[in-house]
Amino acid sequence: MAKIVTLGEIMLRLSPQGNDRFIQSESFRIIPGGGEANVAISVANYGHEAYFVSKLPKHEIGQIAVNAMRRYGVNTQFIARGGDRVGLYYAETGASMRPSKVIYDRAHSSIAEANPEDFDFDAIMEGAAWFHWSGITPAISDKAAELTRLACEAAKRHGVTVSVDLNFRKKLWTSEKAISIMRPLMKYVDVCIGNEEDAELCLGFKPDADVEGGQTDASGYEVIFKQMMQEFGFKYVVSTLRESFSATFNGWKALIYDGKEFYQSKRYEINPIIDRVGGGDSFSGGLIHGLLTKKTQGEALEFAVAASALKHTINGDFNLVSVDEVEALAGGNANGRVQR
């Protein structure tokens, strides 16, 4: 299997029990997770040699995050240690018409204040097949944006395939700031992943589609995919399409374009959703595995969508599924019967 590198922040999610609201809670569960950390764990579960690059404090709270990565087989040798803070976020799980809610407390975390000398990106990228990052990392600080650029440059020097999940977060930066940072980084990217909102707010493109209104046909994305491909020279443009009927009932499918053909995956109805956090990251992890191991872009996309559908049934940020489990769902086995 391949050496896959991800760069980003792992945080600690603090969540009330079950569907309790923040204001009624007297205790919180600690759940480690973060975009690129979640991707690293996904590809490690699929048998790849996964490396997570970040910076965490030396104290015990930082060690919680390091241990979470090690537990699921991710190599942590490129996690720098130092600084004072692990990023936190509070997540309240919604139900029915009440949406989930997130409050961030991540300012001045160790990775947000990390310096280039904390990492030897040429050593990190040596022998790697794939490097993945998301728009969350450059959003957390200007220093993290510079680290992202340096990592991308090193990846290109070493012939590494680069993927990005645009992943716009309005609580971290404005669209204007995102466009100014993200567009120059696209010259390093081979595989661009994002939904219709990400394409508009991170790159300035406006697709003719409305997921909230239920318009999730591939035709609404064809023009925008072609524009993105023409401007940035991506090998693949990929988008997930989510229909949100309630906090616990979503429709889920995806599209991929390789410059020649569009492919739309099968559609899943996920009901009930156990935990939506990490759903997009599980898609990215599945797509990376699929593009590395499958014969066609369609097969790769079906693996990614099935992997992500399964993630919605699992508590926590991490997609703790095997290749066989994903293949079974992608192949049509969604009956939920006991596997003996």
What does each model-found stretch correspond to?
Residues M1-N75, I79, A95-M97, I111-P116, ...:
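Glycine-rich phosphate/adenosyl-contacting loop at the front of the ribokinase-like
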Residues I10, I136, L166, S282:
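Active-site metal-binding loops of divalent metal-dependent hydrolases
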Residues Y90-A95, S322-R340:
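C-terminal domain-closing interface element
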Residues E92-A145:
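Conserved phosphate-binding/catalytic loop of the ribokinase/pfkB sugar-kinase fold
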Residues A154-T161, F232-K235:
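A short helix->loop->beta-strand "cap" motif at the edges of active sites that frequently abuts
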Residues V162-V164, C192:
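Hydrophobic faces of well-ordered beta-strands that scaffold small-molecule active sites
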Residues L172-G259:
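Conserved phosphate/ATP/ADP-binding segment of small-molecule kinases
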Residues Y263-N333:
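Conserved post-catalytic alpha-helical subdomain immediately downstream of the catalytic base
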